[in-house]
Design a protein with these regions (language model features):
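Mature, structured domains of secreted/extracytosolic soluble proteins
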Residues: 1-314
């Protein structure tokens, strides 16, 4: 609380007593936040969930007092878009991890965002920025920056439309988690193959890469290809599996018309795009596969779900 002097004491009323003071008393968190990044979060009604989260884990003062920071600030709608409507399910440790994943340790205006598209957060892990036509910027393939360069005394805010969540594991771990989901489980065939003794070396090779892209056939894709796969040798099935991963962290916006992607088995897949959105892959059998879900982000890469199994030259 700030200081104020009592200038008239003991003014009696029917339901209490009044002491007049010569200044407005402010809670300490209001006083130290004025003019800072924290002020925007505290006093803008669009950021009430973010403000509550920062206060819950005692990070509000940090955001107000640390100099030269950049905050990618999710508004209330951004939390809802990420499926977060309450903070009740978060431990303080998890909430701190999520919040610090939204902060860079330098003042970075929109014109200064790294050309390479990689920025390290205070949480310690990187975020990945994609620069699209018309000046649009995506983070980790799914979150868009919708307002930029709100400058305050100790840093700058960019408002985002979806809360950032640090990846829960590498892309093999994430595929396994999706296969074991309580609702909408998928990729069970793919992950069972990767977990088997026969192909665990492929899973290990994927895990070992720092930047890799996995085109993951869903269960329906494997069912549709069961006749073909049943006639393959174990070595040929291994060749099929390595034909679904490529080196490099390629988000959907990195997949462009006419591109040839070299897979881990050294064979290529051709990319076709329709209206810059629909992505179609053509394998060595000239069969076409649709990318049906994009930018599932992992610690060492990204997953795109596909609706057919890619078949290489065998």
């Amino acid at each position: 609380m700030n200081d104020a002097t009592v200038i008239a004491a003991d003014i009696q009323s029917v339901n209490g007593v009044i002491h007049a003071v010569d200044g407005v008393l402010l809670p300490s968190y209001v006083e130290y936040s004025l003019g800072t990044v924290a002020e925007v979060v505290l006093f803008d009604s669009d950021f009430t969930i973010l403000a509550a989260a920062l206060r819950q884990v005692d990070l509000l003062e940090t955001v107000a007092t640390v100099n030269d920071i950049t905050v990618f600030a999710p508004d209330n709608a951004a939390f809802v878009a990420a499926g977060i409507t309450s903070l009740d399910g978060f431990s303080d440790e998890d909430l701190t991890t999520v919040l610090t994943y939204h902060v860079l340790g330098a003042r970075v205006l929109s014109t200064q965002l790294p050309e390479g598209g990689i920025a390290e957060t205070l949480e310690g892990r990187n975020i990945y920025l994609g620069y699209l036509f018309g000046g649009r910027v995506l983070i980790n393939g799914l979150t868009e920056i919708k307002a930029v360069d709100i400058e305050k005394s100790n840093g700058v805010i960019h408002v985002i439309d979806r809360t950032l969540v640090p990846p829960a594991g590498d892309i093999v771990d994430i595929a396994i988690a999706l296969a074991n989901a309580d609702e909408g489980a998928d990729f069970t065939v793919l992950t069972s193959l990767l977990a088997s003794d026969e192909y665990s070396d492929i899973a290990d090779a994927v895990r070992a890469q720092d930047n890799i892209t996995l085109f993951a056939p869903n269960d329906a894709a494997f069912e549709a290809a069961s006749g073909v796969i049943a006639g393959l040798t174990p070595e040929e099935i291994g060749e099929v599996l390595t034909y679904h991963a490529s080196l490099g962290r390629n988000f959907s916006y990195d997949l462009v018309q006419g591109q040839n992607i070299t897979m881990l088995n050294a064979q290529t897949v051709n990319v076709t795009t329709i209206n810059g959105e629909t992505i179609i892959l053509q394998d060595k059998s000239a069969d076409e596969t649709n990318v049906i879900q994009v930018n599932i982000h992992g610690s060492n890469g990204v997953i795109h779900a596909i609706n057919k199994v890619l078949i290489p030259n065998l």
